[in-house]
Amino acid sequence: MSGPRSGSGSGGSTGRPGDADSQRSAYEKEVHELTTQVTFLEEEVAMLRRRLSESPRQVRVLEERLAQVQVELQTATGQNDKLVATLREARDQIISLKEEVDRLAQPPSGYGVFIRGYDDGTVDVFTQGRKLRVTVSPNVEADVLQPGQEVMLNEALNVVEVRAFERQGEIVLLKEVLESGDRALVIGHTDEERVVMLAQPLLDGPIRAGDSLLIEPRSGYAFERIPKSEVEELVLEEVPDIGYEQIGGLKGQIESIRDAVELPFLYKELFLEHKLKPPKGVLLYGPPGCGKTLIAKAVANSLAKKVEAQTGQGSGRAFFLNIKGPELLNKYVGETERQIRLVFQRAREKASEGMPVIVFFDEMDSIFRTRGSGVSSDVENTIVPQLLSEIDGVEQLENVIVIGASNREDMIDPAILRPGRLDVKIKVERPDAEAAKDIFAKYVLPELPLHADDLAEHGGNREATCQGMIQRVVERMYAESEENRFLEVTYANGDKEVLYFKDFNSGAMIENIVARAKKMAVKDLIESGVRGLRMQHLLSACLDEFKENEDLPNTTNPDDWARISGKKGERIVYIRTLVTGTKGTEAGRSIDTIANTGQYL
């Protein structure tokens, strides 16, 4: 067994020597290739390791570059937006400037007054002193054009726009409307008469002779009726808000004027049945400050309420034309008479509508004096006849009554006072003690702040406190005591009479006394913090009021002053004041040496 094994072994090693070399060469070659590959791979690995170590730094560089590029992009975007906005603004400015240039380059537009239109679309207009027939722009509806309306004309004198009616011009007086209805005869400021066309607003509304019209003299159109302030100011469109309950101490006078004014209007059938004519006028006379004007206003208020209750309408109305005497006087001859005519013309117009109208003349003696009694002029010679004719004209009207007020009825022309004109004469006298209490009660009210001490005296009853205050202050005012002596008058026959403050009291004086007392209460509250009106305030106010009226009008005719103040009878030739000072040491004085004027006397 060992023989063949060694034989085969030696035979094999000696039999193939070339194969071993080739194998070795192949092996070495393979080793060399592998070594080369390993070396390449090692270099590749080294290079990869080197690249791997360098990658984070490159990433950071790239990120920084990217951030820088983004910032530059944002900056460029903002600059681009600004540039776009600038370009747009420049374009808008260019467009605006172009429009402005085009607007300024347009030819001027003229104005004209529309006269009439035609079926073919043309119209007549008056412009620049010429009457032209022109066409109307398609943008303008020719049907809406009204006579007298202002229109705008382009360069070719075509109507391109409709405007409102003219609002400025001259004021003329309407004399009459002509038969055609669209023309009127007017009187200018120089008494020049001319015929004008009536614009559409005047064609739609009623106009009367005597109205003031606004005209444009070049076109000859009247556009608007202008209210006449001289008459409109005298008309109180709203009913006066004064009622009979607000007037104190004049119950008898109120009843008399209600019988004269309200009964004929509210019970017309009964008056007709008894063939009784209603009075045309009422004269309220008496001293100043006693309520004559208040009564006249209360009549209008009461009459309006009675009309509302009788007719069932929602809002009763009574027109109250309040004419103060001196307002009518004018330096031009005939102006006063004209204004009187206008006042009664307005009264007739309102009365024709079924509304009661009261024409109230305050201070009637200032213009309707006895004819022939003027010193520097005799204007009353024409004013009085004008009023007489107007009052007689009221005879045919059912709803107009004249009320006059005066504190010198003896100076009014007797023709005005006779029956058939101012039929009813009501004397508004100075208040006596009972009337004074009634007047005080209108102003000293329980809801006023009253002093705690005064309330305590009357058990906290506010009504009783007010009554107690009124009772004491009236007793103080009407006491015929030494401190209340006011005047000593000497009559023509030599008799003398002492007059007290109560003889010159009035409703206005009582109102002023209460106002003084309230002001004292306010000052006490401000200075000392004590709230409430008290008795002492009223008594002090009464003394202050008496003291103020110490000075009388400086007149050389005491009898005239006595008539104004309400003391009438035998002629007075001398008046001496008896008012003493606070200490009772001041002597009486003659009025002839006194220059100041009292408040109510």
Curated annotation (Swiss-Prot):
GO terms for biological process: modification-dependent protein catabolic process; proteasomal protein catabolic process. SMART domains: AAA. Residues 19-106 form a coiled coil. Residues 1-29 are annotated as: Disordered. Residues 18-29 have a biased composition (Basic and acidic residues). Keywords: ATP-binding, Chaperone, Coiled coil, Nucleotide-binding, Proteasome. The lineage of its organism: Bacteria, Bacillati, Actinomycetota, Actinomycetes, Frankiales. This is Proteasome-associated ATPase. It comes from the Bacteria. Residues 600-601 are annotated as: Docks into pockets in the proteasome alpha-ring. The keyword Hydrolase does not apply. ATP binds at residues 289-294. One of its GO terms (cellular component) is proteasome complex. ATPase which is responsible for recognizing, binding, unfolding and translocation of pupylated proteins into the bacterial 20S proteasome core particle. May be essential for opening the gate of the 20S proteasome via an interaction with its C-terminus, thereby allowing substrate entry and access to the site of proteolysis. Thus, the C-termini of the proteasomal ATPase may function like a 'key in a lock' to induce gate opening and therefore regulate proteolysis. Belongs to the AAA ATPase family. Consists of three main regions, an N-terminal coiled-coil domain that binds to protein Pup and functions as a docking station, an interdomain involved in ARC hexamerization, and a C-terminal ATPase domain of the AAA type. HAMAP family: ARC_ATPase. Pathway: Protein degradation; proteasomal Pup-dependent pathway. GO terms for molecular function: ATP binding; ATP hydrolysis activity. It holds the Pfam family Prot_ATP_ID_OB_C.
